[in-house]
A protein has these predicted regions:
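Short, non-ligating residues that shape and space the ligands of small metal-coordination modules
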Residues: 122-125, 157-158, 170-171, 196-199
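Eukaryote-skewed repeat-based solenoidal scaffolds used as protein-protein interaction platforms
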Residues: 130-138, 142-150
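Short linker/helix segments within small regulatory modules
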Residues: 135-141, 174-182
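Alpha-helical oligomerization segments
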Residues: 186-187, 195-250
Length: 250
């Protein structure tokens, strides 16, 4: 059994109305078996298990983020060590949340629209025609709400790759014309991952507000390196939890 099969056990199931006798010799796992296995995995790989459940939306991410925060605080990074304690305590939690958001992304996930800040609308200054009681029309400039064209008023956008639309492969037009039959290749935009990663420029913009004299060297060797280590830690812990679950349920 793998971790991807766990979320369905957290969803309520409708009763099976049938006159068929249930099988008594089935080798399948019951819900009780799965829950017991989860308890054992949680005791052996608490961080990885919490990270996965938080990623799929089953569990609140607070515990997983706290575990990542403890890991980040223990990192011996020269750039972060030079910061004042106040600035360090402001930057590290942000980097942790950014890394968790990057780890949680998939082709099916949604993200807040950055163009409208999740509101679905833009406040724009437009010329509006006003009519007085006497019938005269006057043109005035007013702030009006307009639908965001990027998210179409939803306030969120899909994180799926725009090149392959979450498929991981795209049509190879050159070879298709050559062979006369559809030929596909790995999407060069997402490298087959099916989704786009969070651009680290967002994190850099936030860090630069707290560290105005931030240089490229400090960013890549310090803050960006911490983000990469945190994301790698997430995947390592999830893989360890997966190994423990398979060992328990084999």
């Amino acid at each position: 059994m793998n971790l991807e099969a766990l979320p369905k056990y957290y969803s309520p199931k409708s009763p099976k109305l049938s006159d068929d006798a249930p099988a008594t010799g089935s080798g399948g796992l019951t819900i009780t078996d799965v829950m017991a296995a989860q308890g054992m995995v949680q005791s052996k790989a608490p961080l990885g298990f919490s990270l996965f459940l938080a990623k799929v939306g089953v569990q609140d991410p607070q515990f997983a983020i706290e575990g990542l925060l403890n890991y980040a605080m223990a990192l011996d990074n020269p750039t972060l060590n030079k910061l004042s304690e106040e600035t360090r305590l402001q930057i590290i939690p942000y980097l942790v949340n950014f890394a968790f958001a990057d780890y949680s992304r998939s082709a099916a996930s949604k993200a807040r629209c950055e163009h409208c800040a999740g509101t679905g609308f833009h406040n724009v200054l437009r010329e509006v025609v006003k009519h007085s009681r006497s019938g005269e029309s006057v043109i005035k400039e007013e702030w009006v709400k307009e639908l965001c064209q990027h998210c179409h008023g939803k306030g969120e956008v899909s994180t799926a790759c725009r090149g392959c639309k979450g498929k991981g492969i795209v049509l190879d037009e050159k070879r298709t014309r050559l062979h006369g039959t559809p030929v596909y290749k790995i999407c060069g935009r997402c490298n087959g991952n099916r989704f786009s990663r969070l651009p680290t420029t967002q994190a850099r913009h936030h860090v630069q507000k707290l560290v105005p004299d931030l240089t490229d060297y400090q960013w890549y060797k310090g803050y960006a390196d911490v983000i990469d280590k945190l994301v790698t830690k997430c995947w390592q812990e999830e893989a360890y939890a997966e190994t423990q679950l398979r060992r328990v349920t084999r």
